[in-house]
């Protein structure tokens, strides 16, 4: 699962989930994904609500080839599934939102890269979801994420309002406000601390309560 692979009910095939950090792709990456879908599947892509792309009906024996093809354009499947930090999502208008105090994309990218393959979050009790919102409109939907960051500027310092503990599982919950303002250079240390607590003290017996 941590390699972005889910089994399907149909025998001998599986679903591949591709991470699209903060919902941004280059034209080369999109072309590569399309070519891989044509070659290894049925030429159809499923775009998810959390800015991933899924390819269904991939032959089990050809999966390593597919991984290698995607890697040629730095497209990753790693930790797109399983009890890891899932795809870091962001407002779809990040970078050109007229209401944004700044572009959240570089911060989402830095957080994504820091926690990808990070040993502190490889065997958690449950998956962990993070989002970035460009403005108070909260188009990144921070209130339904484990951690949500909403762009803010205070005294000419870039930072974020931080939301924690949201979810849409079997027991849906609106996130709480953890910080009204946290400087941008503190978001990675904050998330690392939250992950360590979640990993050590989080529910592991009942997935519905995790």
Predicted regions, residues:
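Intrinsically disordered, low-complexity polar/charged tails and linkers
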Residues: 1-6
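Small-residue-enriched alpha-helical segments and adjacent helix-cap loops
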Residues: 8, 13-157, 189
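Mobile "lid/hinge" segments at catalytic clefts and subdomain interfaces of large enzymes
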Residues: 122-210
């Amino acid at each position: 699962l941590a390699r972005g692979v889910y089994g399907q009910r149909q025998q001998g095939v599986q679903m591949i989930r591709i991470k699209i950090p903060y919902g941004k792709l280059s034209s080369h990456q999109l072309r590569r994904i399309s070519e891989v879908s044509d070659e290894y599947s049925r030429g159809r892509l499923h775009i998810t609500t959390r800015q991933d792309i899924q390819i269904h009906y991939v032959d089990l024996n050809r999966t390593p080839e597919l991984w290698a093809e995607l890697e040629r354009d730095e497209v990753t499947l790693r930790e797109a599934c399983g009890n890891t930090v899932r795809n870091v999502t962001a407002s779809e208008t990040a970078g050109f939102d007229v209401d944004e105090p700044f572009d959240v994309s570089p911060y989402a990218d830095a957080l994504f890269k820091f926690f990808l393959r990070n040993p502190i979050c490889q065997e958690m009790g449950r998956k962990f979801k993070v989002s970035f919102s460009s403005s108070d409109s909260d188009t990144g939907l921070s209130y339904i994420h484990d951690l949500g960051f909403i762009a803010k500027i205070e005294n000419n310092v870039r930072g974020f309002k931080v939301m924690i503990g949201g979810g849409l599982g079997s027991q849906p919950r609106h996130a709480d406000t953890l910080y009204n303002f946290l400087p941008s250079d503190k978001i990675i240390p904050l998330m690392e601390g939250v992950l360590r607590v979640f990993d050590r003290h989080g529910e592991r017996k009942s997935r519905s309560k995790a």
